[in-house]
Amino acid sequence: AKVAVGNGADYDPWATKAAQPTKATLVTAAETAGIKEGDNPHVWFSAKVRSNTADAITAAYQKADPSHKDDYAKLNKEWHAKEDQLESKIKETSAKTEGLPYAATESVAWYLADDLKMTDATPKGYAQASANESEPTPADIKDFQDTLKAGFIKMFVFNSQEANSTTDQIT
């Protein structure tokens, strides 16, 4: 391969290791937007990451295969036109969702909610435990349950791929 694409933010360190012995240019999505190791790794939900990564992939292919430079530029332009439609819908929706509180059992949708200008109302203790991949305390779980029962949360994000006995107590 001449170009390899990874997530970054310590989500897929194996990808970096696999690309190192090759001559492939590694494009790491997180790095294109300045997202560092330890930050939220669910970067593909970020408009900035998608756009920056598309441009970085295009540049990598243009460098690896300069005879098709114009073709890659055309494909990038076509992709951006579609992405712009999505971004327009997100911007339109954000006018309605700005400031609305949401809560999440884990941070998978954080970047999307941020683009929608929503407010993360996930109880801090629970959010910190989830981010550190540790168990929340019984008090954290109760705080989350109470937050949901209070009725002010407008969107609840549950990642079924991360379901466990703790999330069962909340959902």
Give short role names for the model-derived ranges.
Residues A1-T171:
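Extracytoplasmic metal-acquisition and chelation regions
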